[in-house]
From Swiss-Prot:
Stated name of the protein: NADH-quinone oxidoreductase subunit A 2
Source organism: Geobacter metallireducens (strain ATCC 53774 / DSM 7210 / GS-15)
Cysteine pairings via disulfide bonds: none
Molecular-function GO terms, alphabetical: NADH dehydrogenase (ubiquinone) activity; NADH:ubiquinone reductase (non-electrogenic) activity; quinone binding
TM stretches of this protein: 5-25, 60-80, 87-107
Subunit description: NDH-1 is composed of 14 different subunits. Subunits NuoA, H, J, K, L, M, N constitute the membrane sector of the complex.
Any one Pfam family match given in the protein's UniProt record, by short name: Oxidored_q4
UniProt KW Transmembrane helix keyword: yes
Length: 118
């Protein structure tokens, strides 16, 4: 039973060993000369404007949550589409209810004005 998982275990062990060796060798061999320029934040080749400790609008978080919901929707729709023919009418009805609930949620968010920027 465990023999089937042996290749995966070996692959994980090799990945962990490689990662740890990379960290150890880079800390031993790498240069340790910090300077003001090296410690400055880097932003797309431009000088950073303002502080990184600013507050963000709640709208950004709402959009992020909607994006996560969209990703979860895609995660549920993909296996359903792969097994579409095997699930039969019950699977179609179940996914239809799921899509309707999501659609109602998106309409609610839209009507509340969460997607509008002012």
């Amino acid at each position: 039973m465990l023999g089937a998982y042996l290749p995966i275990l070996v692959l994980v062990a090799i990945a962990v060993i490689f990662g740890l060796c990379s960290l150890v060798f880079s800390s031993l061999i790498g240069q340790k000369k910090p300077s003001v320029v090296k410690l400055a934040p880097y932003e797309c080749g431009c000088e950073p404007v303002g502080s990184a400790r600013e507050r963000f609008s709640v709208k950004f978080y709402i959009i992020a949550m909607l994006f996560i919901l969209f990703d979860i929707e895609a995660v549920f729709l993909y296996p359903w589409s792969v097994l579409f023919k095997r699930l039969g009418m019950f699977g179609v009805m179940e996914m239809g209810v799921f899509i309707v609930i999501l659609f109602v949620g998106y309409i609610y968010v839209w009507k509340k004005g969460a997607l509008e920027w002012e």
